[in-house]
From Swiss-Prot:
HAMAP family, alphabetized: Ribosomal_bS16
Keywords: Ribonucleoprotein, Ribosomal protein
A GO cellular component entry from the record: small ribosomal subunit
Organism encoding this protein: Buchnera aphidicola subsp. Cinara cedri (strain Cc)
Gene Ontology molecular-function annotations: structural constituent of ribosome
Any one of the GO BP annotations: translation
Protein's name in the database: Small ribosomal subunit protein bS16
Annotated Gene3D superfamilies: 3.30.1320.10
InterPro entries: Ribosomal_bS16 (IPR000307), Ribosomal_bS16_dom_sf (IPR023803)
Presence of the UniProt keyword ATP-binding in the record: no
Length: 88
């Protein structure tokens, strides 16, 4: 099964997440199929907080990929995908 999920990077107490497409059996920071964006929860005012390729997300959702709850909430919070298209 394929999932859209977060992969943690960055420094201690200052996380930086990559939004990835990965097999469920892969470890959190392990092998992934494609990187479709990033999320920086500690971005400063002049920095980009989130970047997502919505076309690639839609492509993988059509192929049967599932989203984690955190990804679903991020997509709705930053209005990258309408909440009508979100099904988990």
């Amino acid at each position: 099964m394929i999932k859209i999920r977060l992969s943690r990077h960055g420094m201690k107490k200052k996380p930086f997440y990559q939004i990835i497409i990965a097999n469920v059996r892969s470890s959190r920071n392990g092998k992934f199929i494609e990187r479709v964006g990033f999320f920086n929860p500690f971005a400063k005012k002049n920095e980009e907080k989130i970047r997502i390729s919505t076309k690639r997300i839609q492509y993988w959702l059509e192929k049967g990929a599932k989203k984690t709850n955190r990804i679903k909430n991020l997509l709705i919070q930053f209005k990258k995908i309408s909440s009508n298209n979100i099904k988990i």
